[in-house]
Amino acid sequence: MLARFLSSLLKASVTALAVVVAFGFAANFARAERLKNLATFQGVRDNPLVGYGLVVGLDNTGDQTMQTPFTTQSLTNMLSQLGITLPAGKNMQLKNVAAVMVTATLPAFAQPGSQLDIVVSSMGNAKSLRGGTLLMTPLKGADGQVYAIAQGNMLVGGAGASANGSKVQVNQLAVGRIANGAIVERAVAAFQPDGGVLNLELKDTDFGTAERVVEAINRSMGGGVAAALDGRVVQVRAPQSPSARVGFLARIENLDVTPAKAAAKVILNARTGSIVMNQAVTVEDCAVAHGNLSVVINTQPVISQPAPFSGGQTVVAPVSQIDMKQQGGSLQIVKAGASLAAVVKGLNALGATPADLQTILEAMRAAGALRAELEII
């Protein structure tokens, strides 16, 4: 009996130890990612394009041409290029034309004949671009060269209606998209590595991640292929032959690399009140007291009616009432937390709104209780 008891006790101890070890490994395990999600090759990038054009065929929802002279001027110039001359001083009061800006992104290695998606945005006072057709619009790059030509029927995701001063609108009506609405006419200069040397640029600067990238490349491709220049750029020696280089870079992009643990950071959005923090954020024990101050202003119109036949005038005078309330905040303890769940639990215990929580986090950072970098966007 004693031997059987000791045997079962030993098995239970080994099982418990295995569970603890497995849990420890799971807690410290960082998920590996493909290198293409962590870095990009310098020189392989998209290029923005922009153009100015006209949208026609709108159902009385276009620009009010008397208030947008650039629309009238653009329409006159376009008609003159088509051989149509308008009388001098003629004011065109049109409602089915709108001046727009057209934007697109030219991807790397795009060749003439490739098609691009474009976004069309109203720049005047058009009510809606629904049902409109974009006329041929050249799209230029930062160097002023035309790289694509855009034209086509737009798709507007919003909807709206108005009558007798009432208006209902869903989503944005002044912006539309045209799938495959532009055709590439000029290719960007091809990417040529200098002496077979490529620079791999990390999306986030981190010396630890850069070192791991170098180790992964050299382990897979051979020693001396990669070397880190700093915490963001890794230099890679690629084959001289273009065909061999493509396969070489494809293998590098699909290497699995475990990134280093990110620095603790808290992002505060002052416009929306949003707060985002990563898993590395920790807090120390601290005491927090925060009181809210609210000011409410109510304005009521008061009508002053003069006596009959007095010759006075009826006057509407606004009367304002101002109420100021301050809520006292008791001193509360925020316990130290080494995990994100513990940090969230401790901050939620304060019962503060997101706007108040931003101020509290700034004060905690100044007091040294918040172990994270604050970034306000």
From Swiss-Prot:
Main location: periplasm
Coiled coil: none
Keywords: Bacterial flagellum, Periplasm, Signal
Pfam families (alphabetical): FlgI
GO BP annotation list: bacterial-type flagellum-dependent cell motility
Top-level division of the source organism's lineage: Bacteria
Family per similarity comment: Belongs to the FlgI family.
PANTHER family for the chain: FLAGELLAR P-RING PERIPLASMIC PROTEIN FLGI, FLAGELLAR P-RING PROTEIN
Function recorded in the entry: Assembles around the rod to form the L-ring and probably protects the motor/basal body from shearing forces during rotation.
Name of this chain's protein: Flagellar P-ring protein
Organism name: Cupriavidus pinatubonensis (strain JMP 134 / LMG 1197)
Annotated gene: flgI
